[in-house]
């Protein structure tokens, strides 16, 4: 939860939902800035991200002040997550996959039977996560996508941290940053089509 805590709490009430856990993909303000406040209001456990994102969680108050979000606070997860861990929601299990690059401790959640992934800011429909923030690493991001996401299967549908859903197969065919033809060209010394050209709206 990046913020707008009152709206989120109202939505829970409106739809008669019970919040069981808070899952964090990475420590950036727009994904974790409201975590401490929701934890305070509900008492539910915080799971994730990977410990390598402690740096970003510690930066949340400063980042919040910079962007005019006064109640953005740092927090300590009840459970740090690592590659190969499993998280549960009711009786449903999701696999945790550590996918550094956008941030060093970014994780994604994968439901193997449903062919579904929540990928945070690793991958978007037609784009990829930024790596120009502190401790971002462009090559790590490309490796996370090509070596960790693609092997899960082209039929996997994913929800990104921003923008519409897509599938891994669609992105392998047409994403201008990580399509098979692009990564193949880059490996052969072709043009670098990523880097600073990543759309600024994806943070």
Task: Pin down the residues of each PLM region.
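Anionic group-transfer/hydrolysis microenvironments
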Residues: 1-2, 123
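Alpha-helix initiation/capping motif
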Residues: 1, 70, 130-134
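Metallo-beta-lactamase
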Residues: 62-63, 86, 92-98, 103-202
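Active-site HxH/HxHxD metal-binding segment of metal-dependent hydrolases
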Residues: 3-88, 92, 173-184
């Amino acid at each position: 939860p990046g913020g707008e805590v009152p709206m989120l709490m109202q939505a829970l009430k409106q739809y008669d939902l019970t919040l069981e856990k808070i899952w964090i993909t990475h420590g950036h303000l727009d994904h974790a800035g409201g975590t401490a406040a929701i934890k305070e209001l509900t008492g539910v456990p915080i799971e994730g991200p990977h410990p390598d994102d402690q740096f970003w969680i510690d930066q949340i108050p400063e980042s919040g002040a910079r962007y005019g979000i006064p109640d953005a606070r740092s927090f300590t997860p009840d459970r740090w997550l690592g590659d190969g861990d499993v998280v549960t929601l009711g009786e449903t299990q999701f696999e945790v996959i550590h996918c550094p690059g956008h941030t060093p401790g970014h994780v994604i959640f994968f439901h193997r039977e449903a062919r579904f992934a929540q990928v945070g800011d690793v991958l978007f429909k037609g784009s990829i996560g930024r790596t120009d923030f502190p401790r971002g690493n462009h090559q790590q991001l490309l490796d996370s996508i090509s070596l960790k996401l693609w092997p899960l299967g082209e039929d996997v549908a994913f929800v990104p941290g921003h923008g519409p859903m897509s599938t891994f197969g669609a992105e392998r065919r047409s994403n201008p940053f990580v399509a098979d033809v692009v990564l193949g060209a880059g490996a052969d010394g072709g043009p670098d089509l990523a880097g600073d050209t990543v759309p600024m709206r994806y943070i």
